[in-house]
Amino acid sequence: MADQLTVEIIAAIKNLAQSENGGRIPAAIGDITADRQLTSLGIDSLALADVLWDLEQAYGIRIEMNTADAWSNLKNIGDVVEAVRGLIAKEA
């Protein structure tokens, strides 16, 4: 079972994926879980930068990586969740 942070980040990424795909998620994608690859949702490096900005604002954190680093290090939703979780713990 996903924790609250995972649920919130999946929702944010799902919303972004919908906007990147004309307002819908193709049925072929299926369920969106922490294992889901960002590219399978149509999220590219520019869209990832948008979601990282939104997460910084939502959680009061600063993600210290440029878009290229983020793109190479954050391959799936779980990677994003763990990066945010670590930064939240650091801020506490």
UniProtKB/Swiss-Prot annotation:
Keywords: Nodulation, Phosphopantetheine, Phosphoprotein, Plasmid. Proposed to synthesize nod factor fatty acyl chain. Involved in trans-2,trans-4,trans-6,cis-11-octadecatetraenoic acid biosynthesis. InterPro entries: ACP-like_sf (IPR036736), PP-bd_ACP (IPR009081), Ppantetheine_attach_site (IPR006162). The modification O-(pantetheine 4'-phosphoryl)serine is found at S45. It comes from Rhizobium leguminosarum bv. trifolii. This is Nodulation protein F. It comes from the Bacteria. The lineage of its organism: Bacteria, Pseudomonadati, Pseudomonadota, Alphaproteobacteria, Hyphomicrobiales. Residues 4-88 form the Carrier domain. SUPFAM superfamilies: ACP-like. 4'-phosphopantetheine is transferred from CoA to a specific serine of apo-NodF. Coiled coil: none annotated.
